Structure formats: structure tokens, C-alpha cells
Amino acid sequence: FRRVLFRSKTLIEQGDTERAIHALTNFIRNDAHVNDEPYYLLGNAYRKMGDWQQALNNYLEAIERNPESPAVSARDMIMNILNFYNKDMYNQ
């Protein structure tokens, strides 16, 4: 369990987000009782790729599994970014 998460975190940090997403998705698929951490890491990988919707979806799943998850602050950060850009779109 920890090895998969550590490896995925390292892949994300190295920019190999597609491999991290694949590993985490397989891990989640094979263990229905996972905690929030794989979803938080998936959110990070999607955020790094610029896929805001998938990032939010995974952060929300992490928060549902653990309301104290670090995904709470990650979700808030994305919402602030999206709100900022949406305001800019209205001012053009």
C-alpha cells in the first residue's frame, strides 16, 4: 500500500503524471476500501496536467472519505484559481 503511494507521489513530482494516474487508478480499482490518500494523489496528478475537473472530482472523493484530508486545501486552492480566471473572463 505505502509503496504504491510513495512511487506514485514520486512519479507526480518527476512530472510522469500519466504513469502515476495509471498506477493509482489500478490500485483503487483493486481495493475498494482505500482511504483518502490515493484520491488526493490522483487529484494532484490531474491538477499538474491542468485537468481541473478531474482534480476536483478526486479531491472531493478524498474529502468524502476523510474530511480532514489535505485535499480540502487543494480543493480550495483550485476553486480560488477557477474563480479568479472566471472573473477575468467577464472583464474582457
Question: Which residues are covered by each model-predicted region?
Answer:
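Short, small-residue-biased leader/transition segments that mark boundaries at the very start
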Residues: F1-L5
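"A position-specific structural signal for the A-helix of alpha-solenoid helical repeats
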Residues: F6, Y40-L41, A74
